[in-house]
Amino acid sequence: MNETIEPLNPIAFQLGPIAVHWYGIIIGLGALLGLWLAVREGERRGLHKDTFVDLVLFAIPIAILCARAYYVIFQWGYYSEHPDQIIQIWNGGLAIHGGLIGAVLTGIIYAKVKGLSFWKLADIAAPSILLGQAIGRWGNFMNQEAHGEAVSRAFLENLHLPDFIINQMYIDGQYYQPTFLYESLWSFTGVVVLLLLRKANLKRGELFLIYVIWYSMGRYFIEGLRTDSLMLTENLRIAQVISIVLILCAAALIAYRRFKGREIKRYQEM
């Protein structure tokens, strides 16, 4: 028996001819809450409240551009035939790894120009970035994307999910695994872990590197469940390769900075 389930409307409201999508609203909300958290911790760490406001004004647009460019590059076979869709980011298609590249490069340049420690900024921003990612995945939910393989409704009900999530996972006559939810929950858990680790007084830069490891671990396993992965080869998922590289590099950098002998400031030091 075929079911008739209407998906949630991806458009929040209209401003004349302009459609405002939930995808953009949710990503914007994640960015604002992340900024609030960073400003609050930055002030506690002796930084002016405008430090992160100014940084975000540069980092967000650059991160979005890099996230889109990353996605388009690895889907060039499609976009070369549909160039008019390259700018249609409201329909999805922002790669988190691309966004991180843009954000990190912006942070490095910003820190150098302002005479600040990049590692200090990165540590403070780490929980905020992960919070933004956790919230942003719900934009994928509204667009019915970033899901996993086909499953039964009973499978989703056994996860004790609310009906609005189960129904939104009904796409073209089939239910799918809510991998967006798995990653969102993993990221929310990571935010709590990072906030607790701030009290451990790690060496400067280690909180950010732990964020990289945490996110990459979750992304590696969850990516294996997805059906819309960007592929490097027929059987090789780009996000999984990048995740492994990031885990190894972050762990190696932590070890190198701890054992090279030079004194490195602690997180709690101004």
Swiss-Prot record:
Superkingdom of this protein's organism: Bacteria
Which residues participate in a 1,2-diacyl-sn-glycero-3-phospho-(1'-sn-glycerol) binding?
Answer: 137
Q: Cellular component per GO?
A: plasma membrane
Record protein name field: Phosphatidylglycerol--prolipoprotein diacylglyceryl transferase
Principal place of residence: membrane
Q: Which keywords describe this protein according to UniProt?
A: Cell membrane, Membrane, Transferase, Transmembrane, Transmembrane helix
| Coiled-coil stretches | none
The answer to whether UniProt assigns keyword Protein biosynthesis to this entry is no
User: What family does this chain come from, according to its entry?
Assistant: Belongs to the Lgt family.
EC numbers listed for it are 2.5.1.145
Tell me the membrane topology, using the record's own terms: Multi-pass membrane protein
Q: Name one Pfam family in it.
A: LGT
Q: Does the keyword Isomerase apply?
A: no
Name the pathway: Protein modification; lipoprotein biosynthesis (diacylglyceryl transfer)
- Please report the organism this UniProt entry assigns to the protein: Bacillus licheniformis (strain ATCC 14580 / DSM 13 / JCM 2505 / CCUG 7422 / NBRC 12200 / NCIMB 9375 / NCTC 10341 / NRRL NRS-1264 / Gibson 46)
Q: Name a single GO biological process.
A: lipoprotein biosynthetic process
What job does this protein perform?
Answer: Catalyzes the transfer of the diacylglyceryl group from phosphatidylglycerol to the sulfhydryl group of the N-terminal cysteine of a prolipoprotein, the first step in the formation of mature lipoproteins.
Transmembrane annotation, as ranges: 18-38, 55-75, 89-109, 115-135, 177-197, 205-225, 236-256
